[in-house]
Swiss-Prot record:
It comes from Rattus norvegicus (Rat). Brain and peripheral tissues. SMART domains: NGF. One of its GO terms (molecular function) is growth factor activity. Belongs to the NGF-beta family. PROSITE patterns: NGF_1, NGF_2. The gene is Ntf3. It is found in: Secreted. This is Neurotrophin-3. Glycans are attached at N131. SUPFAM superfamilies: Cystine-knot cytokines.
Amino acid sequence: MSILFYVIFLAYLRGIQGNNMDQRSLPEDSLNSLIIKLIQADILKNKLSKQMVDVKENYQSTLPKAEAPREPEQGEATRSEFQPMIATDTELLRQQRRYNSPRVLLSDSTPLEPPPLYLMEDYVGNPVVTNRTSPRRKRYAEHKSHRGEYSVCDSESLWVTDKSSAIDIRGHQVTVLGEIKTGNSPVKQYFYETRCKEARPVKNGCRGIDDKHWNSQCKTSQTYVRALTSENNKLVGWRWIRIDTSCVCALSRKIGRT
């Protein structure tokens, strides 16, 4: 198409030159040479374009075909920072350093001592290994022997070994992973929890509270820790869950008292 355009254009120019009697016309051989050069240039351009297309197709054919990402099916949960339960691997355990909480322990054996940050609490050993932990129970309770010092509420701390469910930070019920398979030996998840021994350590409520003006009661308080959990038995990951962490005295003013 471009060659035909060049020929028509040159014929048009030659016709103009023929009508112009005052201007000397171009020599015949010069005009023919110009036409030949234009045709050769157009042929060369088309040839180079075709070669570039062939090279590009050959290069793409040699590249390995990338697998297209699979579209999630309807009703299938998309993967975020949580993994399917069947894919629980060491990568999740490596994240424990980032999500570490002193009250959560992943271990292949039952812990016999409280975490270092909670050595002064009233630690209660695992009932299964009571004989082994009885000296420790005595040692960790020595701080209560100070004269003149009494706790408003009596608390106890222990490693919970059978936690199966919890409430996460969104208020959803999640399943706590009790055992995680990693390599040769599986590890279990333990939670160091603190709770009240009783709601009323004395007759009228909390110890040392003026019962004439106040109603008092010991209540277990909760806070959030990171733990390996699953939701709807599908997605496994580190979530914030609530566990018992302290015992506090709750007060309310008696009606009619000022």
